[in-house]
């Protein structure tokens, strides 16, 4: 244990010192007067930088397969509403505190999201919302090096240490790493866990953006213990002792270590050059000097010649990506799931839209996959896949119509074939596309992947593919209002019963959903609200709460002539009662039950954020109302109570060299 602490301390210190060991590299301004290659007399070529480095110093974007442009970039800033600490009660997105690894085992989200793209589904996977995956790591483009150091803790034994650094070591070439050490404290046990998360990324954009390359390494080491599952709910509701250790649970000694590794590399090259042309014109102007003499000045005028638009079906950009994903579980059953995949794609969407918006954007590709599962060294199953995909976007005046489709075909099975087809119409009300109206329709067909005995797959040929048909609309007004409504038709829906056997619905059902997100501001007062309204025509197949809400009311002010920024406010969460699925810790499965309802309880937090130059401080009183509750009824799931009152605090330093 002492050696492990020493290794951990040394690693954190090295990560903290890395920003000072790397020399700052700043992207130089592009020299438009430099001649590059043969050109027409009087013309000069202005090569383009990636959009992400044009508008600021530090930006990041997320990995997306078959992407050749930085479509959206984000800037690290002060996070309001106390979100610096992992929220163990984000039930809307399905994050609950059921295990002491990270911030809790995921639950089925209160607001299901049907129609999502096809992907490998692993039931019982630990913490997909918190663990690092290729889909949520960050790639950066920076003008100056950027570093981040953070420490978060509580009055219990929780703590989080994070160190991150990114910089462009040469124009267009960025390297970065992000390491997090977590020690979440057990709620109902005296044990604790130490978890490690690390990702290292690099990406390169040539000066004209034609050559692009990305690579990433992602590693997780997560310990998961049983952290609840009361054998007697009355012991919790009637006992007001703050010492939860020793509370009777279902499987007290269940624990395992998850060790995950993912690798990704990709490169793409555009056959279409990207540049603007400039012509210099010199003119002579005469003016009267102070001594009444005529002074002649040479005035240089630069004309921008419109870019020569390529053909709609141009040569486009070609790319290839390869990935390796390993998820290993030891100590309980030594299960290992691995997937090898590649992606070959072509797209004619190579110009940034502010330069030239292609009226017909086409992306096509194919993605072969190979997956297999081992338990204790014995291969239990493997499967080869071939996944073709296509996406077409057509400009219709100011708006656009997008159609996309993908398939997952098991090469060694004639019956296994998944598919997804979607169509979206987007109409922007302004040129900046800040106010939009969107309508969509999505159809999916997915064969159930039932991962029982942890990651071992138990296929049942009797089960029909789960088919969904979704129609919906969404209205966005800047960042103030986001309203969406949708209706989804389910056929052959599949779930687990109380005996952990798969059950298929004999009748179809409808799920109606509405989501309203608002960010209101009146001077220095802010009110962020998220309201969910749902109705399932068959709650036995699809149990959901009728109403859920998440609200943040806070003041955001600057003090001492803008030197200090402060945010003081409250968070409130609530959802109506419903028959929530229950959790089985041994298999990691959620199964339907009709004996106990959860919900009908309000959770309240109070937080204070302070930002002084590049340092951010926060304190947060989590679940403050638990201090005066007459009876403990704050269950997240049947037999799984939530955490009581907890006091969190933390500090984050950001360095722009």
What is each of the regions a protein language model found here?
Residues 4-7, 36, 517-521:
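Small/flexible residues
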Residues 12, 218-223, 572-574:
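Short, solvent-exposed aromatic-acidic interface loops
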Residues 16, 209, 577:
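Phosphate/oxyanion-binding loops and surfaces in catalytic or ligand/nucleic-acid-binding neighborhoods
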Residues 1-32, 316, 620, 645, ...:
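Bacterial Sec-dependent N-terminal signal peptides
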